[in-house]
Amino acid sequence: MDFENELTSKILDPIHGTIRLTTLEIAFINHPLFQRLRNIKQNSFLYKVFPSAVHSRFEHSLGVLHLSSEILNNLRLNAIRYQKKYDDGHVFGHIDQIPKHNIQELRLAALMHDIGHGPVSHQFESFMPGKHEFSDVLPIA
């Protein structure tokens, strides 16, 4: 993919190996709001039972960014195989035509998906008011 030329930086990860990043992604990662994810455990109190389960939302988010690219790359490879086998003009044959900015948007969405989480946030979701409870103050979409 043409996007490969945009990946100018690397982070070494014990799970995913080398995670390649764009200049824009580095800027997002270096922002204090993203850096705070280093101090939020991904698995909350699970480390009390499994002492080695101590990775942060920061590391998790980097992994999700990496996996989003892996998924896109596998879609591309499968499209090539599909096109060779069937050559029927199916939409899969056009996956290489995804614009670079859309690939970057996908990667940034993956990177930033946990930015709003606080500590033990999933544990408190059941106590949070649902959308229907705000219906009197929120406009109906």
Predicted regions and their residues:
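Sequence-structural signature of the catalytic-core scaffold of metal-dependent phosphohydrolases
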Residues: 1-41, 45-108, 116-141
